């Protein structure tokens, strides 16, 4: 499998990776709205920002679950690749670095590509974006993970609904299962049927199970109704 590794010349983590001597694909585009598409899947390194400025290493898929857009298109998800995302996250979790390590729910663009995209991010301020030791460790873990994708152990492939944007429950599940799209609780009240369907259809691997994390009964019923004919299991937390 040909997995393209990408950095943006407009991104500070990308610049740190270049300083370290890595030769990855370079794009001169905003990382949340790029059009690059080469290979069977894309891994892009980028900065992570948060208001709390919590030091973190995060992994997630792109996609806009609502009409609110930050790059890409409204109500459109990117393509998920559960074994790739989960392999990367498991390797990052092994790092002896005192920062938060977490999956994030699906958010921001791009959404144009027909191949999966996984964001691997360093947060949450310039101190960490330019920290060569942390960035190098992240890159090496990701490269190691890519080599393990084809043989990665997955009890099942899941998609998730509910929980906060930083997804501790789904991050914990990732120790044994492989994770597709996660739609956080903030989008559920107004989520459209078409977006629910995309969580399953826009996945490189067949989804086995839908997992709900503290989701109201009305939303659970809606999701289960929309996906009722797809031979899926449903689990509740």
UniProtKB/Swiss-Prot annotation:
Record protein name field: D-aminoacyl-tRNA deacylase
GO MF term set: D-aminoacyl-tRNA deacylase activity; zinc ion binding
UniProt subunit comment: Monomer.
Protein's GO biological process: D-amino acid catabolic process
Enzyme Commission number: 3.1.1.96
Keyword vocabulary terms for this entry: Hydrolase, Metal-binding, Zinc
Family per record: Belongs to the DtdA deacylase family.
Record text on cofactor binding: Binds 2 Zn(2+) ions per subunit.
């Amino acid at each position: 499998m040909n997995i393209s590794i990408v950095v943006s010349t407009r991104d500070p983590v990308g610049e740190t990776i270049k300083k370290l001597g890595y030769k990855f694909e370079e794009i001169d585009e905003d990382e949340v709205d790029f059009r690059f598409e080469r290979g069977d899947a894309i891994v892009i390194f980028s900065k992570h920002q948060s208001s709390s400025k919590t030091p973190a290493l995060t992994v997630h898929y792109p996609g806009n679950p609502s009409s609110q857009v930050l790059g890409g298109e409204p109500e459109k998800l990117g393509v998920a690749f559960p074994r790739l995302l989960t392999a990367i996250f498991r390797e990052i979790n092994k790092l002896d670095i005192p920062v938060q390590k977490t999956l994030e729910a699906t958010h921001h663009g791009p959404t144009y590509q027909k191949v999966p995209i996984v964001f691997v991010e360093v947060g949450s301020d310039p101190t960490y974006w330019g920290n060569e030791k942390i960035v190098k460790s992240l890159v090496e873990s990701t490269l190691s993970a890519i080599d393990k994708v084809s043989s990665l152990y997955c009890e099942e492939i899941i998609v998730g609904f509910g929980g906060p944007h930083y997804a501790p429950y789904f991050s914990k599940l990732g120790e044994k299962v492989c994770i597709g799209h996660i739609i956080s609780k903030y989008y559920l009240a107004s989520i459209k049927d078409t977006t629910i369907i995309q969580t399953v259809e826009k996945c490189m691997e067949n989804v086995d199970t839908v997992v709900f994390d503290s989701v109201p009964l009305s939303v659970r019923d809606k999701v289960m109704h929309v996906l009722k004919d797809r031979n899926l299991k449903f689990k509740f937390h």
